[in-house]
Structures are given as structure tokens and as C-alpha cells.
Amino acid sequence: NTNETKVRFTGETAKIGVSLEMLGRIFNGAGKPIDGGPEIIPEKKLDINGYPLNPVSRNPPNAFVQTGISTIDGTNTLVRGQKLPIFSGSGLPHNTLAAQIARQAKVRGEGEQFAVVFAAMGITNEEANYFMEEFKKPGALENAVVFINLANDPAIERIITPRLALTTAEYLAYEKDMHVLVVLTDMTNYCEALREIAAARNEVPGRRGYPGYMYTDLATLYERAGRVKGRKGTVTQIPILTMPHDDITHPIP
């Protein structure tokens, strides 16, 4: 009932409570547990938008992440702290690929801790059930944190989901010295949510109705990958998107 709905501004940005207890858990797109487990007792609360990172403080990527996919490991090697996008088409098995990478990725080296943060945005119930079953396989969820946003969830939640995932990854990487691989799928659904929210706010549309700040917004996500001087952990990203109508010239790709 919108007539009786009240909104109170707190003067603060959205935050997520983070803890090592998040490993092995599955959350919805708003960060609430959906695996039947208890609520997370947070060690601290972090701004989901992250914090400014001085480019000078970045270290160049130079170490290998093994995905277990021969075409990636052999010809498009994924390096810790790198962003490696996967462009897919409608009907292609990108969900299978995403689940396989999340399940079997690892880093080599003695004493190296590794974790996967998986964020699915705007997926169907069938796809969500597929991912849930994949992560329930033995050993798949042990070092993973999973966020699942469904297609029938609010669009604003779809905007929050990748930020929750990246904030969790930064916590594990920079405060717990872990090498974290973040898999984001499907970024096309994220951009569609951006367009929907921009239209609801009566903003001036850009190409094909997408907001003019879409690329800036995407940069706030992609630039959170990297290696930071003085920190052992790293954040590596694999964003996956389906090209609308298989068109590489579409604004999203």
C-alpha cells in the first residue's frame, strides 16, 4: 500500500555485515540467507559502494588463477587482480560455464587461501535451482559465497547484488588475505535494471534508452578488481553477459 508507506532517510549509504561465516552460504540479492541457515553475525559493516582506491596504490597483476577451463587457462589466462569478461549469446551455455568456473577455480602456491564470490542477477527460478544444485555438490560451496537475485525480484535489488558481492570479496581479500574470484552473471540483466530505474526517475535516456551514465556505473564495479600494495589478497573478476540479439555493437557489450 503506497499510500501508507513511509520512508525515513538515515543519511548513510547501504552497508552489508561481513564475516568469515559467509563462506559456504547462499544469500538472496539483498544479502539475506536463503539456504535455511542462521543469520550472519557480522564482524563489521562495510559500505557496499566500496572506497576510493588510488591508482598509484595498485600492483600490476602477475600471478595465475587456474579456472580448470582449458581454453581460458591456455589462451586467455586469468591473472589475479584482472578482469576477464565472457561475452555470450542467447541460448549458449554460459550458466554452465559460470558454475563450472566457480566450482573448480583455484590458485597454486603453499599457504595461499582462495575463495569464490558468485553473484547471479535477474535469473529465472530454473536457473537459480540449477546454480543451487551445482553449489550443493561436495566441496563446491566450502570456500564460496553465493548471491542470487531472481528476475521477479525488485530492479533496485539487482543494482545492489553485485555491490554486495564485491564488498564481500574486498573484505575477504584485503582483510583476510584471500585470493578472491568474483563471477558476475548476467551483466545484461544488471544494465536492464539500470535502464528501468532511470526511466522511472524520468532521466534523459541515452542510446536505446540506457542511461548516459551506464558506462560510468559499470566502471564502479569493474574497477574494484585488482591488487593493492601492502595487501596479500587480490580481487579477480569474471563478468559474464549475454549480448542482446547477439549484437556486439549493442550499448551493453
Swiss-Prot record:
The keyword Ion transport applies. GO terms for molecular function: ATP binding. It comes from the Archaea. Pfam families: ATP-synt_ab. One of its GO terms (cellular component) is plasma membrane. One of its GO terms (biological process) is ATP biosynthetic process. SUPFAM superfamilies: P-loop containing nucleoside triphosphate hydrolases. It is found in: Cell membrane. It is a peripheral membrane protein. Keywords: ATP synthesis, Cell membrane, Hydrogen ion transport, Ion transport, Membrane, Transport. The keyword Ubl conjugation does not apply. Has multiple subunits with at least A(3), B(3), C, D, E, F, H, I and proteolipid K(x). Belongs to the ATPase alpha/beta chains family. Component of the A-type ATP synthase that produces ATP from ADP in the presence of a proton gradient across the membrane. The B chain is a regulatory subunit. This is A-type ATP synthase subunit B. The gene is atpB.
